[in-house]
Amino acid sequence: MRTRSCLIPLTAIAAMTFTAQASAQAMVREQKVISSAGARAMVDACTAWAERNHLTLAMSVLDWAGNLVESHAMEGAAANAIDTALLKAKSALRWRRPTSEMNKIVRTGQNLAPTFMHDFPQPGALPIVVDGEVIGSMGVSSADGEKCAQAAIDVVFKKQGTPPAP
C-alpha cells in the first residue's frame, strides 16, 4: 500500500516533466540564416554576371527577417539604385515570390495589396530558398535583376559554377 501511494505522485511528476519538455520543444524551431559570407558571395556572383552582360547595377541581400545583410552599388549605378534594390528585396521577402510575379498580379488587378503595403512590385528580386525554406531575398536595381539574382543563387547555393549569360 505504501509503495502504491508513492508511485502515484512519482508518476504524476514524471508525466508533468515529460509534458513540459515536449512543450518547450514545440516553442522553438530551427531557422536557416544567410551568413554575411553567403550574402557577400551572392553580391560578388551578381556583380560578375552584370559585368559579363555589360550592366551597371545595385543589389541588396536581406536575411529571413528583412534585415540588410549586404548591399553594393557598382561604380556608375544610378543614384536611386540602392533604394530600388532594397525595396525590391523587401517586397520579394514579404510576399515570398519573385517581384516579377507580383508585378503581373498587380497589373492584372488580381491583387492590389502590394501597391498600398509600401511594396515595390517591379521585376528584379527573388526570395532565397534553401531546402524549401525562405532564408532571405536578393533585390537588384535592373529590370534584368531577377536573372542576376538567380545567377547568384545558383552559384552560391546550388554550386553549379558560373551560369551562362542570357
Regions found by a protein language model. Name each.
Residues 24-166:
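Flexible, solvent-exposed loop/hinge segments and secondary-structure transition points
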Residues 19-21:
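N-terminal signal peptide c-region/cleavage motif recognized by signal peptidases
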Residues 1-10:
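Bacterial N-terminal signal peptides that target proteins for export
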Residues 16:
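NTP-dependent nucleotidyl-transfer catalytic core
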